């Protein structure tokens, strides 16, 4: 075969959060549609794309290392993603990068690829691109990104400077994508964005259309429509606006999963004010109590930052007291670290590293105890579990309380007659700090 007829091959490295993963899926889908072949090794690739993360310093370092590796192993590299918004920082370390674009610059990335590795004239791969596009997740679950950007200006965050203000996708487009994914075999949709509860705010919640029917562009309307698809629907990155209360009844009725991922960040009003986050802890506790009264099965996940500038021992104790009272099911904790360009860098009273470390361990120790107690309460119950994989020891799945990658798992030892994506009923027999063990019962 002559050189001109060879199928051009692209290598791809995707880093960062699920939102970045969705961006990678979109670029890969376009490449496959245009006839490019995506290959798993640097040696086989004519060009390598690195989709970067730039949210915190460790992510920046990982991205720079990935770019360096791609340059060393291949030599022709295009960079995109969040770190791409800081072109000078990349060029300083890796001047040989061919092109750099920011996040969700799909057309720009493709244009650069076309320049360095022209599109094939004959396209034998179009028929092989599935209707739902190229997915980087297992077949039975997928991320559904409903918007880009964020209108908040949290002092620890630089996302708006990289991804811009809130830009909601048309609701008809989102629901069409959801329907395609379900038709392709997806059993669980994970709704993601920078701020899921703000969906539609930028469009003044304009009315869109789906299946010939008018639908309001809002999180609640979206949930009502997704509920009709007959699959698991899980909400992530939900800012605690008042209208979040409206989705709890949908969870209680079994229409969407009883699971809320709400990044609360802290419990001290002073620290929350320094972060530019909403700060009524009493109101948050009242709402948590009310949500659980409406939907007793509700799982609450949150993330917090310890060691934020100005955080005193008293502030930190308020956070521990909040954890004790709220008894959240799933919690992530980060030690504050300066992010280039974040307003928090300018705040006085930076907390020493050894104090951050000590507070982090105290926080995790308390939450581990709470998590253990919450999971012990599940022993003896029968829970729906979605199977993720089957290995030599048995099946591994997740309950409604477990999102992939970030939460716990349900282990079904010696259970081999199931397959990924199957939802089974499991009697829970054992629990530790984060995971459950059980046996499948008759369906």
Swiss-Prot record:
Annotated binding of [4Fe-4S] cluster 2, by residue: 150, 154, 157
EC number of the protein: 2.8.4.4
Highest taxon, organism lineage: Bacteria
A single BP term in Gene Ontology: tRNA modification
Domain TRAM: 376-442
Subcellular location: Cytoplasm
Cofactor note: Binds 2 [4Fe-4S] clusters. One cluster is coordinated with 3 cysteines and an exchangeable S-adenosyl-L-methionine.
Ranges for domain Radical SAM core: 136-373
SMART domains xref list: Elp3 (SM00729)
Catalytic activity: L-aspartate(89)-[ribosomal protein uS12]-hydrogen + (sulfur carrier)-SH + AH2 + 2 S-adenosyl-L-methionine = 3-methylsulfanyl-L-aspartate(89)-[ribosomal protein uS12]-hydrogen + (sulfur carrier)-H + 5'-deoxyadenosine + L-methionine + A + S-adenosyl-L-homocysteine + 2 H(+)
Protein keywords: 4Fe-4S, Cytoplasm, Iron, Iron-sulfur, Metal-binding, S-adenosyl-L-methionine, Transferase
Main location: cytoplasm
Cofactor(s) recorded in Swiss-Prot or TrEMBL: [4Fe-4S] cluster
Function of the molecule: Catalyzes the methylthiolation of an aspartic acid residue of ribosomal protein uS12.
HAMAP family, per the entry: MTTase_RimO
Protein name: Ribosomal protein uS12 methylthiotransferase RimO
Organism: Proteus mirabilis (strain HI4320)
Gene name of the encoded protein: rimO
